[in-house]
Amino acid sequence: MINMKKEDLRIIFLGTPEFAVESLDKLVEGGYNVVATVTMPDKIAGRGHHLLQSDVKKYALEKGLPVLQPTNLKDPAFVEELRSYNADLFIVIAFRMLPEIVWSMPRLGTFNLHASLLPKYRGAAPINWAVINGDKQTGVTTFFLKHEIDTGDICQQRSIDIDDNENVGSVHDRLMHLGADMVISTVDSIIDGTFETKPQPEGEFLPAPKIFKETCKIEWNKPRECVRNLVRGLSPYPAAWTDICDANDSVSTLKVFETKLCDDLQSEQSLMPGDIICTKSRMAVMCADGLLEILELQLSGKKRMTTQAFLLGYKPKACK
């Protein structure tokens, strides 16, 4: 049993996006001793080339926490600075793959919060892929780091059900809150010596690779439920997309945010995948096994809108 109060446990927190901030906030507001944070370097963004700070950095500065932003995690100067904090525990959430010289540094080890029920969905985009694949359940896992990515011994897991109409934004937010609670629970179990770990099962499991632009392209020759799940799994960001032709055969990019299965629109002609049926206020696209109605969308250069608003100024012909 570790004989110390939570105020005496020196923690370094490593993370970047909003998903990580929720856990950091729980630690800080809960009186845990976060002695430093590590996050990505600022990025140049926008036409004005402004420096964009990570969500973790913004929060850390608000709370007066030290912020380390290494470009190279193996840089001797960074490693030495990290070591100077004499931390007992590292917590990693939505950061980068850590070298052993970093994750092996604290005496109590380094644990990670991962947004899946490991060993399923190891990789960069676990929430997206759970929804894209039509899973009915997902969750969060805390585990201790070792050499292979996302393969360490599991500390705790908690699960949630995924609603059939839920998009990845909603699942992300629920897992963010659930994960933050579990981070606290994991830290508490380490402090009081009640934590237990178990190895991850061996075998082949669905991965969660990084999402690229081509990952997001809709293939209308797939079953409509697969297309609907792709849209859900990428909404609101980065969003599924398709090329769309208007009545003049001009091609534009169309982002699709919300869809539903459609069985009440009919066509007098036989339809091929990508063909469109429209009324004054509705638009559906033919998939391999039926029509999928688009409810919310965004044409390139325009704002996000309902299909009804879109059809006031656009005459679609087909999707590609």
Where are these regions (language model features)?
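Internal anion-binding site segments
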Residues: E202-K320
